[in-house]
């Protein structure tokens, strides 16, 4: 037989780019096919034609009967089988080498990029550790000298397994059609020019039968390994997909609803838009994700709060310790009472739910309390105050004054009067801006040197009998000021804004 070194050297390269089942298949191909065929089977079929004898003296009858008994020598048939079954592996090897060169180029580019990152003096410690770990991984890939089996290379690998399986089945069927599973010692020849029926005798029939059964068995084992390898790749891919889904599920459970918390630094905007009750994620400035379920009422509204500091949204549904609220700086606190029916409800995880019912069912009211302060550039002068009182009667006022104290940077307490919106039959007709500016002028004449901070007041109300239109698209701008006084209880529903503007759309 010819030299198998060239084919063996190429298949050794395929061995390094195969799975564990593919390596077993290649081992069987090397040992039980090529080695057995080159060492033992060739000697068994060496005297195949010379020892084939027929009981006739008719010239040419022996050759005709031998050709009819052995259309192709089993040795050559098995050689063709090995070559054809190995050819898909050679095609896969060519693709793997191409991908390996491309992978090496990408690895070099990535290595240069990571080294350039390591030279960056502004790189923090955590990022340096990540880059160093990536460089070590690239060096390990260089030592392995192997391409990851994924993507187009994986598709080529599966295709070459299917192709060699089909070829294996074809050669097994061909061997069965030509010779069956047994080599008979006597062959009846009826071909011309042999007279009538001629008996021909085959040399070493039992030994040849053993080798035929052995090669059939090896072919069946190779086919079984091909099927197992396909299942192995499929199960591994399914397991990876399941692992990816489980990890993504765990991540989603840890981070909460689809809208995750985001840190805003610099001149950013905090926008909340809603037309239906949704689940949203609130912002937090301490680099920790905290997700809160919020049911937003059915109103087409959007409010923007530009602020040059990081914003944090905190939610509570009842009375809290207002000292903790005062100590936090650069935060946006949103408080909403827990309505009884179809109003906004905001509940923090771990917080006891509130069961407060206010107002009749056909005249619901919604109020928000917001506080936003800046940790730097806080004015030292006293804030002017706009306030308006409300009588104890539940007559019909729409603007109600709430007061709260705010602690400044110098430790002094400041009290800010704000307005809230409640439903009333005719009180919305009055312009709160005119009252605001008039009282501001009175306070300004008294204080003289006080400074005022511009802000905007949001007026959100919901009603069924007498709904009021939303503000215009350009938004309202008002000025809110404060004075030095104290209040015993925190406002239940109010909106206080310092050093910012709120636009209502």
Swiss-Prot record:
- Which key words tag this protein in UniProt? Cell junction, Cell membrane, Gap junction, Membrane, Transmembrane, Transmembrane helix
Q: Which Pfam families match?
A: Connexin
Phenotype caused by lack of the gene: Mice are fertile and show no obvious anatomical or behavioral abnormalities. In horizontal cells of the retina tracer coupling is abolished but the spatial tuning of ganglion cells is unchanged.
Looking at the record, which segments are called Disordered? Answer: 371-491
Q: Which residues cross the membrane?
A: 17-37, 77-97, 166-186, 210-230
Q: Where is the composition biased (Polar residues)?
A: 371-383
Residue ranges, compositional bias (Low complexity)? 447-460
Q: How does it sit in the membrane?
A: Multi-pass membrane protein
For biological process, the GO terms are:
cell communication; detection of light stimulus involved in visual perception; gamete generation; response to light stimulus; synapse assembly
- Cytoplasmic-side stretches of the chain, per the record, are 1-16, 98-165, 231-505
The cellular location(s) given in this protein's UniProt record come to: Cell membrane; Cell junction, Gap junction
Listed GO molecular functions? gap junction channel activity
What would be one Gene Ontology cellular-component term for the protein? connexin complex
* Cysteines joined through disulfide linkages: none
Membrane side Extracellular: which residues?
38-76, 187-209
Tissue and organ expression note: Low levels were detected in skin, heart, kidney, testis, ovary, intestine. Expression not detected in brain, sciatic nerve or liver. According to PubMed:15147297 expression is detected only in horizontal cells in the inner nuclear layer of the retina and not in other neurons of the central nervous system or tissues. Detected in the outer plexiform layer of the retina (at protein level).
Q: Where is the composition biased (Basic and acidic residues)?
A: 437-446
Subunit text: A connexon is composed of a hexamer of connexins.
Q: What does this protein do?
A: One gap junction consists of a cluster of closely packed pairs of transmembrane channels, the connexons, through which materials of low MW diffuse from one cell to a neighboring cell. Involved in tracer coupling between horizontal cells of the retina. May play a role in the regulation of horizontal cell patterning.
Q: Name the protein family.
A: Belongs to the connexin family. Alpha-type (group II) subfamily.
Protein name, UniProt field: Gap junction alpha-10 protein
């Amino acid at each position: 037989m010819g030299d198998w070194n060239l084919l063996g050297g190429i298949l050794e390269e395929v061995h390094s780019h195969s799975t564990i089942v593919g390596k077993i298949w290649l081992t069987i191909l090397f040992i039980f096919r090529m080695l057995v065929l080159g060492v033992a089977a060739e000697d068994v079929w060496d005297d195949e034609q010379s020892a084939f004898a027929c009981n006739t003296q008719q010239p040419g009858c022996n050759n005709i009967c031998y050709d009819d008994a052995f259309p192709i020598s089993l040795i050559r048939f098995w050689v063709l089988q090995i070559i054809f079954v190995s050819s898909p592996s050679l095609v896969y090897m060519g693709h793997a080498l191409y991908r390996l060169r491309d992978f090496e180029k990408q690895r070099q580019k990535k290595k240069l990029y990571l080294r350039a990152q390591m030279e960056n003096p502004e790189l923090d410690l955590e990022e340096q550790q990540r880059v160093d770990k990536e460089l070590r991984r690239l060096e390990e890939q260089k030592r392995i000298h192997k391409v990851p089996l994924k993507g187009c290379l994986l598709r080529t690998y599966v295709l070459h397994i299917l192709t060699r399986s089909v070829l294996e089945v074809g050669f097994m069927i061909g061997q069965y059609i030509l010779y069956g599973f047994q080599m008979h010692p006597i062959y009846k020849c009826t071909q011309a020019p042999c007279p009538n029926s001629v008996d021909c005798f085959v040399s070493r029939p039992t030994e040849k039968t053993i080798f035929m059964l052995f090669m059939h068995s090896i072919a069946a084992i190779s086919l079984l390994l091909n099927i197992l390898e396909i299942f192995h790749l499929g199960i591994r891919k399914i397991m990876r997909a399941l692992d990816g889904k489980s990890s993504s599920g765990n991540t989603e459970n840890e981070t909460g609803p689809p809208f995750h918390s985001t840190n805003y630094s610099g001149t950013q905007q905090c926008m909340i838009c809603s037309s239906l009750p949704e689940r949203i994620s609130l912002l937090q400035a301490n680099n920790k994700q905290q997700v809160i379920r919020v049911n937003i009422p059915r109103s087409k509204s959007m409010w923007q709060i530009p602020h040059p500091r990081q914003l944090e949204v905190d939610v509570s549904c009842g009375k809290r310790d207002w000292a903790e609220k005062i100590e936090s700086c650069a935060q946006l606190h949103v408080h909403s009472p827990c309505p009884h029916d179809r109003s906004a409800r905001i509940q923090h995880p771990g917080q006891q739910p509130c069961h407060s019912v206010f107002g009749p069912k056909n005249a619901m009211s919604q109020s928000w309390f917001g506080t936003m302060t800046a940790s730097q550039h806080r004015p030292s002068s006293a804030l002017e105050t706009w306030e308006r009182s409300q009588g104890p009667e539940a007559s019909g006022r729409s603007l109600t004054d709430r007061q709260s104290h705010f602690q400044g940077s110098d430790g002094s307490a400041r009290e800010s009067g704000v307005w809230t919106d409640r439903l009333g039959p005719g009180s919305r007709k009055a312009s709160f801006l005119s009252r605001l500016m008039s009282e501001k002028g009175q306070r300004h004449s008294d204080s003289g040197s006080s400074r005022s901070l511009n802000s905007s007041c949001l007026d959100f109300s919901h009603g069924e009998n007498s709904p009021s239109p939303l503000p215009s698209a350009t938004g309202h701008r008002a000025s809110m000021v404060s004075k030095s006084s104290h209040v015993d209880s925190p406002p239940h529903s109010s909106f206080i804004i310092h050093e910012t503007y709120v636009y209502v759309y």
